[in-house]
Amino acid sequence: MFHATTILAYKGKNKSVIGGDGQVSFGNTVLKGNAVKIRKIKDGKVLAGFAGSTADAFNLFDMFEENLEHAKGDLLKAVIEFSKAWRKDKYLRKLEAMMLVLNREKIFLLSGTGDVVEPEDGKIAAIGSGGNFALSAARALDKFADIDEEKLVKESLTIAGEICIYTNTNIKTYVIEDEK
């Protein structure tokens, strides 16, 4: 069984940020400590990250990028079409991966069953083995600290990496800033 990662997405006042740790584990063994499981897509206007089976996630990334192209960059339309395709395809329903996607307007969690979930607060979502730790830390920092969006994501993932054995503190982030 692969236990692979923690991904955190945060849509702040001036920036959207996605971050992930670098650990990939198989059973009780760390296979890799510097994997990159986040991407910039659609000319850097959309951020995406995955947790779960790596091969499955790459297939999902490719499919999602195609949907985003067909939707001309409209993230909401792309996630809805992606979800429809996922639920109709017997092969896709067996994929063991989840994705987070966001731009400056929206943030979505795409589940392994084809569900599309927009976080209740509309700004913070996390997936993966350390996702609940990162989500808790991000909510607390968002509520009580006045820090930069990217720093919030890095600190939250670091906290998750200190608690979850399937998450490390080799953090990578991507940022989309408001156009000036």
From Swiss-Prot:
MF GO annotations? metal ion binding; threonine-type endopeptidase activity
- EC annotation? 3.4.25.2
User: What are the record keywords, sorted?
Assistant: Allosteric enzyme, Cytoplasm, Hydrolase, Metal-binding, Protease, Sodium, Threonine protease
Regulation affecting activity: Allosterically activated by HslU binding.
Look at the named UniProt entry and state the broad enzyme category this protein falls under: hydrolase
Gene Ontology cellular component list: HslUV protease complex; proteasome core complex
Q: Which residues bind Na(+)?
A: 161, 164, 167
PROSITE patterns membership: PROTEASOME_BETA_2 (PS51476)
- Recorded family membership: Belongs to the peptidase T1B family. HslV subfamily.
User: Which HAMAP family does the annotation name?
Assistant: HslV
Put simply, this protein is called ATP-dependent protease subunit HslV
Organism, by scientific name, is Campylobacter curvus (strain 525.92)
Q: What is the lineage of its organism?
A: Bacteria, Pseudomonadati, Campylobacterota, Epsilonproteobacteria, Campylobacterales
